[in-house]
Amino acid sequence: MSKKISARQWLVYIIIGLIGQVAWVIENMYLNTYIFSFGVGESYSTYISITNAASAIVAVLTTMLLGTLSDKIGKRKFFISVGYILWGISTLSFGFIKVTTIQGLFGLEALSAAKTAAVLVIVLDCIMTFFGSTSNDAAFNAYVTETTDSG
C-alpha cells in the first residue's frame, strides 16, 4: 500500500530542491564572470578550467563518500539541514573576496592581488561544493527517493 505524500511534504521537496538549484546556478554561471572581473589577464581561462575541474572532483568524491556515510548513519535530515546552512554561508562568502581588500591586506600589486583572489575563489568553490554535494546530491536526493513511492 502506498503512502500519499502530503502537500506540506511536496512543498518541502520543491523549496529545498529549488534552493539547491539556485546555489548551483550561482556557482556555474557567476563564478566565471566573477573571476573574470578580477582582471587576472590572459590567465582567465586557466583559472576557470581549474575551478571547474576542482569543483567536479570535489563533487564526485563528496557525493560518494558522504552519501555512503549518510546511508550508514541514516540521519539524512541532519546532513540536509546542516549542509544547506553551511552551503548558504559559503556561497555568501564569495562577496567578501575583493581584489582591493587583498591588496590592502597583503600589500600586493593589482595583478598579484587579482590572481590571489582567483585562487581564493577556487578554494571557496571547493568548500561550497563540498557542502552542496553533501546536502543536496548525497542526502537530499536520497531522502526524496526514500520518502516517495515509486509505484
Spans of features found by a protein language model:
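Helix-to-coil boundary motifs at intracellular loop junctions of multi-pass secondary transporters
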Residues: 34-39, 72-73, 143-148
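C-terminal ends and interior cores of transmembrane alpha-helices
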Residues: 81-115
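The feature captures the transmembrane alpha-helix scaffold of multi-pass secondary transporters
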Residues: 10, 14, 49, 104-105, ...
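Cytoplasmic helix-loop-helix junction between adjacent transmembrane helices
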Residues: 125-151
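Hydrophobic/aromatic residues within the transmembrane alpha-helices of Major Facilitator Superfamily
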Residues: 18, 22, 57, 89, ...
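Central cavity-lining transmembrane alpha-helices of secondary-active solute carriers
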Residues: 48-70, 84-96
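Residue positions within transmembrane alpha-helices of multi-pass solute transporters
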Residues: 26, 61-62, 136
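Helix-loop boundary and gating motifs at the non-cytosolic
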Residues: 2-58
